[in-house]
Regions:
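Short beta-strand elements at the ligand-binding edges of bilobed clamshell
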Residues: 94, 151-176, 190, 222, ...
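Flexible loop/hinge segments that line or gate small-molecule binding clefts
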Residues: 127-165, 187, 279-289, 293-294, ...
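C-terminal motif of bacterial Sec signal peptides marking the signal peptidase cleavage site
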Residues: 35-38
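Hydrophobic alpha-helical
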Residues: 121-139, 207, 221, 225-286
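Extracytoplasmic "Venus flytrap"
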Residues: 58-80, 84-85, 93-111, 117, ...
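Short, solvent-exposed amphipathic alpha-helices that sit
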Residues: 73-90, 166-173, 198-217, 235, ...
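Hinge/cleft segment of the Venus flytrap/periplasmic-binding protein
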Residues: 40, 47-59, 191-195, 199, ...
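Hydrophobic alpha-helical segments within soluble ligand-binding/sensing domains
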Residues: 105, 159-185, 231-233, 280-284, ...
Length: 349
C-alpha cells in the first residue's frame, strides 16, 4: 500500500493523504513547532539531539531518527520530529553522522538495539551493505527508512521522495533552462556524495531517462565527494577547468548546490553553465534568486521527520501503515521562489 501527499499551494499546510481507492486516510499537519532541542557531539564524529521538552513528562515511546550526514537539510527534518513529539506524546533522539560514514550508522544501530528504544527511522548510507543489520533491527523493533530506501531489507515503511520522479523533474528543468539559454550541445556533469545510496541511484536513473538521449550532449562520469564539501567544490572547479564545453551542471545532494554556485562564481569562464540543484539550502535559494541556479528540486524534509515518527507510533500501536509514504517534490525557480522562501523561513523559526 502506498500513501501519497498530493501537491498543493503550500508545502507545509494541512494535507489530505489518499491511500487507495478503497480507503482514505485524512491527516491534518499543522505547521506549529516544538522548540528547545539540545545537541551533543561525540568524539567519534557524530552528533545526537533530543527534545528538552520531551523529558518533562512521560513519553509513550522512545524513537531514534538517524540521518545520513550533517547537512543543514536535516535541521528542517528535526522540526518535524519535534512537532511529532508534541502531537503523539513520544520522545525522539536524532543521530547525525557528521562525515556521512557507514561505520557511524552501524554503531548508532548497534547502540539503539541495546538501549530502550521502541523503533528507529534511518536514511541508509549504503542499503545493500547494511541489509543484514537492518534485518536484525527489524526483528527487534519497527524500522522505517526515510529519504533513501533499503528495499531489499525487512524495513516496515519508506517515507520520502519518489527519487526517480525527482530525477526526471531535474532533467526536465535542465532541458527547459538549456533551451532558454540557447545551448544546443556540450558536456553534462553530475555531482553527488556517493552513488551507493538509493536516492542517488534513483535520481540518476531519472536524470538518465531525460538527459541520456539528449542530442548534442554527453553525460560525463559522476563526480563523487563522499559528503566532503571542500572536495565537492574542488570537483566542480576541476570540471570547469577540464571541460571548456561544460554546458550543464547538476548537484544531486543538498550541499552540492552551494558548492557548485561557489565554484562557478569564482570561475573566470565567460559562458556560465546551466545549473540545477536539489533541496533548499540558503545559498542554493540565493543563487536561484540571482539567476545563477536555474532551478532546485526541493523535497519535504519536515515531513520526513513527522511522517517517520507517525509511522513508528502507528506500528507500535498495531495500526495498519502503508509501506510507502510519498512526501512529494516541488521545482523552485525564480517565479515561485519568494512564496517558497517565505514558507521555509516561517518553518525555521
Amino acid at each position: 500500500m502506498r500513501l501519497s501527499i498530493p501537491p498543493r499551494t503550500s508545502r507545509f499546510a494541512p494535507a489530505v493523504f489518499c491511500v487507495s481507492r478503497a480507503s482514505v486516510l485524512w491527516v491534518s499537519l499543522l505547521p506549529g513547532l516544538l522548540a528547545g532541542a539540545g545537541c551533543k557531539k561525540s568524539d567519534s564524529g557524530a552528533s545526537s539531539s533530543s527534545s528538552s521538552a520531551s523529558g518533562d513528562k512521560a513519553a509513550s515511546y522512545r524513537f531514534a531518527f538517524v540521518t545520513n550526514n550533517s547537512s543543514d537539510f536535516w535541521n528542517i527534518a528535526e522540526k518535524g520530529l519535534r512537532k511529532a513529539e508534541k502531537d503523539f506524546g513520544v520522545r525522539v533522539d536524532m543521530f547525525r553522522p557528521l562525515k556521512g560514514e557507514i561505520s557511524d550508522q552501524q554503531r548508532f544501530l548497534e547502540d539503539i538495539m541495546v538501549q530502550n528504544f521502541d523503533g528507529v527511522a534511518i536514511s541508509p548510507i549504503n542499503p545493500d551493505a547494511m541489509t543484514s543489520t537492518f534485518d536484525r533491527v527489524a526483528a527487534k523493533m519497527p524500522l522505517v527508512c526515510h529519504d533513501s530506501d533499503a528495499p531489499k531489507s525487512k524495513r516496515n515503511v519508506y517515507v520520502g521522495t519518489n527519487n526517480i520522479e525527482a530525477g526526471r523533474s531535474a532533467g526536465a528543468a535542465a532541458i527547459a533552462a538549456l533551451k532558454a539559454a540557447n545551448i544546443t550541445k556540450g558536456k553534462i556533469a553530475l555531482f553527488v556524495g556517493r552513488m551507493d545510496m538509493q536516492n542517488a541511484i534513483e535520481r540518476k536513473q531519472g536524470l538518465d531517462e531525460t538527459l541520456g538521449k539528449l542530442p548534442g550532449f554527453e553525460v560525463l562520469p559522476v563526480f563523487l565527494d563522499k559528503t566532503d564539501r571542500a572536495l565537492a567544490k574542488k570537483n566542480v572547479e576541476d570540471a570547469l577547468a577540464r571541460y571548456p564545453d561544460l554546458a550543464l551542471i547538476i548537484g544531486i545532494w543538498s550541499y552540492n548546490g552551494p558548492c557548485i554556485a561557489g565554484a562557478v562564481r569564482a570561475s573566470s569562464r565567460k559562458d556560465k553553465p546551466v545549473i540545477i540543484a536539489f533541496d533548499e539550502e540558503e545559498e542554493t535559494l540565493k543563487s536561484v534568486q540571482d539567476g545563477l541556479i536555474s532551478a532546485t528540486i526541493v523535497q519535504r524534509p519536515f515531513q520526513f521527520g513527522y511522517q517517520s515518527i507517525k509511522a513508528l507510533k502507528d506500528l507500535k500501536d498495531g495500526k495498519q501503515v502503508p509501506t510507502v509514504v510519498d512526501t512529494g517534490i516541488l521545482t523552485v525557480k525564480k517565479d515561485n521562489l519568494e512564496q517558497f522562501w517565505n514558507e521555509l523561513r516561517e518553518l525555521k523559526k
